[in-house]
Amino acid sequence: MPPVAFIDNKRAVAALFQEALLSAYPVLHKDDAPFVIEVDKPKNPDHGHFAVNSALQLAKKLGARPRDIAEAIVGALPKSDLLAGKPEIAGPGFINIRLAPAAETRVVESVFAAGDEFGLGTEGAGRKVMVEFVSANPTGPLHVG
């Protein structure tokens, strides 16, 4: 595997929020199927780089208001140079996240550092794959499923 120090900000944000969620709600440690934080890109760029709606998804399970859950998650976030300030809680419990400028530039720096090896990996090596071409709707997002 090439020495690529590619920093995936989306995964890093997910890990940060997963840690905060489990810190705020230790009861989730006991679940057979642990809850996994999903980080999405908001449709409106004014809402930040990423958004998390886990508070809405967990409200019924935790028996709490989504906004209270969101506040607990944000309050439990560990210090990180990944985020630009405190994430914003919007609406009923959405958490909007802005990345620090340094976090964005680290991705570009890792691409240049990898040089010609950027994008190479060993996942799936030696196996055949089938690639299908789609007729995508240019006005909507592309998805699988």
Stretch-by-stretch model annotation:
Residues M1-P42:
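Charged, compositionally biased N-terminal leader segments and the immediate start
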Residues D68, S80-A90, F118-G124:
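Short, flexible active-site-proximal loops enriched in glycine and acidic residues
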Residues D46, F50-D68:
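Short, small/acidic-rich helices and loops at N termini and domain boundaries
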